[in-house]
């Protein structure tokens, strides 16, 4: 699904969240949105999902204006949002049941998808009985089971430890390669953006506008991101992070004199 944002702006009352934003995201492309907290990245996702309407401008999927939620566009949050009274298999199957697919068939497909995310044998466990990483694997299975054309990810791994996060990034990349959805990823983790994305949009503080766009599509990437050191530093500088670190280092040096 091609996602198109045309002169999109968003206000909440007097709060100007997004300045005019115009970008096309090609079918099958993965774009990461990076920027300060509260700058409007998640709001862009919600508009693509049909949960929010732009104050001005248009958001479209394959040329059709997005006017509300649709199974073709799946939104996944940092919180796994699994129902605690349902097993992992039942949670995953629910995505198909909402589309009026037979309960037995939905359960069979859910078992297949749990196997795809390495949760075979945990189908009948409840969310509280497994780790946070396993819950997020189940949430990934639920996001992919309906084979969405667009996958909208709002910091899906932000609450996980570094090792689990890297493992799930690998799992996500494998699933994307299998299904080929368009993906928009909101993240505060620059390394995650560099590893997963074809393009990265770096946003300013609110009202959000794109400070710079980075094209990474021709790179075959591993978690060793040393070849992206210059790009990483530039992104951090755009976010003001290195400037703060350099100032902190100067202050520490001054204390030792």
Segments and roles (model prediction):
Residues 34-36:
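The feature captures the beta-strand-to-loop junction immediately N-terminal to the Walker
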Residues 125-128, 146:
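Conserved signature/switch motifs of ABC ATPase nucleotide-binding domains
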Residues 49:
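Helix-to-loop junction immediately C-terminal to a conserved catalytic motif
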Residues 89-97, 107, 111, 215:
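Short helical segment in ABC ATPase nucleotide-binding domains corresponding to the A-loop/adjacent helical element
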Residues 57-69:
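Conserved ABC transporter NBD signature motif
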Residues 76, 140:
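Hydrophobic anchor residue at the start of the ABC signature
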């Amino acid at each position: 699904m091609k996602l198109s944002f045309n002169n999109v702006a968003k206000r909440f009352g007097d709060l100007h969240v997004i300045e005019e934003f115009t970008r096309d995201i090609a079918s099958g492309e993965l774009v990461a949105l990076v920027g300060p907290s509260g700058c409007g990245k998640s709001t862009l996702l919600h508009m693509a999902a049909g949960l929010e309407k732009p104050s001005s401008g248009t958001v479209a999927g394959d040329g059709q204006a997005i006017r509300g939620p649709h199974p073709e566009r799946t939104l996944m949050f940092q919180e796994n949002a699994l129902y605690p009274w349902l097993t992992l298999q039942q949670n995953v199957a629910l995505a198909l049941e909402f589309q009026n697919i037979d309960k037995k068939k939905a359960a069979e497909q859910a078992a297949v998808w749990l196997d795809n995310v390495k949760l075979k044998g945990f189908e009948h466990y409840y969310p509280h009985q497994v780790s946070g990483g396993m819950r997020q694997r189940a949430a990934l299975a639920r996001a992919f089971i309906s084979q969405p054309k667009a996958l909208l990810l709002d910091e899906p791994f932000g609450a996980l430890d570094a090792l689990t996060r890297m493992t799930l990034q690998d799992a996500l990349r494998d699933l994307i390669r299998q299904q080929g959805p368009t993906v928009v990823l909101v993240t505060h983790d620059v390394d995650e953006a560099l590893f997963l994305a074809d393009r990265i949009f770096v946003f300013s503080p609110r009202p959000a506008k794109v400070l710079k766009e980075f094209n990474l599509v021709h790179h075959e990437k591993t978690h060793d991101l040393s070849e992206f050191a210059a790009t990483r530093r530039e992104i951090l500088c755009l976010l003001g992070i290195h400037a703060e670190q350099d100032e902190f280092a100067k202050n520490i040096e001054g204390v030792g004199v």
